Amino acid sequence: MERRTFLTSAAAPLVTGIAGQLSAQTPAASRGRLKQSVMASVWQGTKYSFEERCQILARIGFKGVDLPTAQQVPILMQNGLAPGMMTGTGTSFQNGLIRKELHDQIEEATHKGIDLCASVGCSVLIALPGERRGMSREEGADNAVAILNRVKGYAEQKGINVCMEITNSKVAADQRTDQIFDHTAWGIDVCKRVNSPRVKILYDIYHAQIADGDITRTLRENIDHICHIHVAGVPGRQEIDDKQELNFHFIAGVIADLGYTGFVAHEWRPAMGNDSVKSLERCFEILNV
């Protein structure tokens, strides 16, 4: 066989195979499958009032805002937006679910937080595992399981998801260097042990990429344990554009294809000199699959 003939015939199945792979990776469904919300960080450096922010978000196509106050919720609703996630478990990044000495007050606060969520139409209540301060991961997991077992019944009764957020312990600037939930596997293990449809994790893709990587496989294997998602560019926690290492448009397609129905919240900060509204418009379209 002549060299030219051989190369032509050999290339044909290769091209066909690559085309098939790309076709398989491209979502066939229409855009708009993900509900997008924002955290306050996206407005850094702006002077818009809360109502003006809501009007801008609604115009772009966003569906919610994370961590509004109870007083802000009516303004959200007047603009066709919803609270994506609420706070109110008595936990913090310093003192969280793993502190046994705080379990009584965490239980009381979480019941009130669940009631608040139910009253404003929000299905997600954030709960923070907290700092280790010398505690082993095993003891911390046992303590988290213990308090979550105490609140899961009420969460199930009210239909509210209590979710733990993963944070990385590597980047000093994030000020989360001693968090116990700094690898996805720790939180998934806790969820499996609690075994409740209302105890899940907030999968923060910025933190998870730094902590573990392997984002899409983790999503595919654990989507049933995820009730909320945060996004920001890696490194730097800025926009989710082509100036950082993750392909968020592809990741968004994976999330949508898995049938995920929760919010995907933008938690980036605009890069120096960038206009927040224009960045919101661009980043919204990146996740619009």
Model-derived regions, located:
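Histidine-acidic metal/acid-base catalytic patches
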Residues: 2-58, 121-123, 181-203, 207-289
